[in-house]
């Protein structure tokens, strides 16, 4: 049986992306869908998360799913249990899908053909973040009604960003032109879906300014020299925002380091779609859960802790 995993954006065709975005738009416009029978899903987060974890949980509960919230610190993972055995255990007791965030790049490669329930990737190391990409696509589509011909700048810590990787690939597939702007030390030469240009050249040209969080936790050491000058050299300052072209928007996957990637007063400015992205995250995650569980139509309401 083919599993409806969601692991990377590269595995989704343009048609599949369009179908997910259409379902997400329907949910955004008030469509309701509930499971007809009790259906358990488990959220396995091995890295800290606020937006993605709670967004998935809200999406699950809106769909009437029973949510199993997994704590790695309080589980048999601490006793040496493998991720495969953890998923097989959840599968054996009746769980129908798992949402996983893990610090290991492509943790799912050794699992996807071995388990019998869908895996929804909520972020793998520096690798992929498909639901973040999909909510970004939804936000852009709501704004411009298209992807073809748009110019999009992805700015910041490109090397360590799974958001940059997923978005650059998907947006290129959909017809947008991608540019990167980054400190030299944080360029990702393996990401071939965009062209590097100086930030100040991109500011007046692009339709979307997509800022990336500086990922302190993924650096081998804290690049203090870069950080001292980051906002002035590589961040979206008030002065740069004034030079952005009419109708262009600001995006950021969050959490935001205010006055680092973006001036604090711009986080909720007229151009900003940062909190709109968060809102859209719920609708997109409802859509990918619907794809993973085609029988989603009604169900139970309470939460279980494991």
From Swiss-Prot:
Pathway: Pyrimidine metabolism; UMP biosynthesis via de novo pathway; (S)-dihydroorotate from bicarbonate: step 2/3. Carbamoyl phosphate binds at residues 51-52, 101, 129, 132, 254-255. PANTHER family: ASPARTATE CARBAMOYLTRANSFERASE, ORNITHINE CARBAMOYLTRANSFERASE, MITOCHONDRIAL. Catalyzes the condensation of carbamoyl phosphate and aspartate to form carbamoyl aspartate and inorganic phosphate, the committed step in the de novo pyrimidine nucleotide biosynthesis pathway. L-aspartate binds at residues 79, 162, 213. Heterododecamer (2C3:3R2) of six catalytic PyrB chains organized as two trimers (C3), and six regulatory PyrI chains organized as three dimers (R2). It comes from the Bacteria. It catalyses: carbamoyl phosphate + L-aspartate = N-carbamoyl-L-aspartate + phosphate + H(+). One of its GO terms (molecular function) is amino acid binding. SUPFAM superfamilies: Aspartate/ornithine carbamoyltransferase. Its EC number is 2.1.3.2. Belongs to the aspartate/ornithine carbamoyltransferase superfamily. ATCase family. Keywords: Pyrimidine biosynthesis, Transferase. The keyword Transferase applies. This is Aspartate carbamoyltransferase catalytic subunit. One of its GO terms (biological process) is 'de novo' pyrimidine nucleobase biosynthetic process. InterPro entries: Asp/Orn_carbamoyltranf_P-bd, Asp/Orn_carbamoylTrfase, Asp/Orn_carbamoylTrfase_sf, Asp_carbamoyltransf, Asp_carbamoyltransf_Asp/Orn-bd. GO terms for cellular component: cytosol. It comes from Bacillus thuringiensis (strain Al Hakam).
């Amino acid at each position: 049986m083919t599993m409806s995993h969601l692991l990377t954006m590269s595995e989704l065709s343009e048609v599949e992306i369009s179908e997910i975005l259409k379902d997400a738009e329907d949910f955004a416009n008030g469509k309701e869908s509930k499971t007809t029978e009790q259906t358990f899903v488990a959220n396995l987060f091995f890295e800290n998360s606020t937006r993605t974890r709670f967004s998935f949980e809200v999406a699950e509960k809106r769909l009437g799913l029973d949510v199993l919230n997994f704590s790695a610190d309080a589980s048999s993972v601490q006793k040496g249990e493998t991720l495969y055995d953890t998923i097989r255990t959840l599968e054996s007791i009746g769980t129908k899908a798992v949402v996983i965030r893990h610090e290991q790049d492509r943790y799912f490669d050794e699992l996807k053909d071995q388990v019998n329930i869908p895996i929804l990737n909520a972020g793998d190391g520096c690798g992929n973040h498909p639901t973040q990409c999909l909510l970004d696509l939804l936000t852009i589509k709501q704004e411009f009604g298209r992807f073809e011909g748009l110019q999009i700048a992805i700015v910041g810590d490109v090397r360590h960003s799974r958001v940059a990787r997923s978005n650059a690939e998907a947006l290129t597939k959909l017809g947008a032109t991608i540019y990167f702007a980054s400190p030299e030390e944080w360029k990702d030469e393996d990401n071939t879906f965009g062209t590097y240009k100086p930030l100040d050249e991109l500011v007046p040209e692009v339709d979307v300014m997509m800022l990336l969080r500086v990922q302190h936790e993924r650096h081998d050491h804290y690049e203090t020299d870069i950080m001292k000058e980051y906002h002035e050299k590589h961040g979206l300052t008030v002065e740069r925002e004034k030079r952005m072209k009419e109708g262009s928007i600001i995006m950021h996957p969050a959490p935001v380091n205010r006055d680092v990637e973006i001036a604090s007063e711009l986080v909720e400015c007229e151009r900003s779609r940062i909190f709109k992205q968060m809102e859209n995250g719920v609708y997109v995650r409802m859509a990918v859960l619907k794809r993973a569980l085609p029988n989603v139509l009604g169900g139970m309401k309470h939460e279980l802790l494991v």
